[in-house]
Amino acid sequence: MGYEIKLSRLTELGLFETDLYFTAAFNATEAMRVNRAVEVELINKRAEKARDIAAASSNFADSLFGTIRGGDCCVINGINVSMSFLYNLNYEDFINHARNYFDYLAHIIYLVYLRDKKKIDEIDFGKLIKNRSLIDNAEISDLISTIETNDLFTYISDYNNITKHNHGINTPINTNFRTFEMVGMVFPFSKEIKGVERTHDLALMRDKMKEIHQFVLDSQQAFLKEFDKIYTQEGNEK
């Protein structure tokens, strides 16, 4: 779709309620793009600080040690903040936006393809999966199945669930002290679902963010390609 989805057109189609979710879905993908940029910036800042410490006198280096490990401190509005903390927080935010995107998509699909067949309270992607068989559109039904069975969707759901309800997941920054090259990692984690343990391996954060973001964008484009048939059809009103 090479055009903006307009509220006026959605209203003509009797789909004005979807406007909120189209906006939320777009904002989620944009937020993920920003999270990826922040990840790069934090790594660069951390490497810059490490080079400064290495080049400074021992007194300067010692002055950086306190409640936050030397080389990991940045100042935001006069407050000392750990860059490692921000790095972890940014990744959790990224995953949260990815998971939210699929719930926003579920709302849109429900309102467009399912609402006339079954009333569902508090729709989310999990409930959409359970009611997929009621959707007459084969392409949309296949898209839901494709998302559900993708390992990245499982990763997103498990990471989001664990960090919201159980505990944080470590995201260390590995440093080459000769070159000061730094690489962010995401530690392995597991989630037990109905007696089955799902394990996710150690990952390079930047690569994982790129992979997940592309998965979300591909899912978005696949949906919009099918929705386009409704949006552009003359005289097509629900």
Annotate each predicted stretch with a short phrase:
Residues M1-N96, Y104-K238:
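Acidic, Ser/Thr/Gly/Pro-rich intrinsically disordered interaction regions
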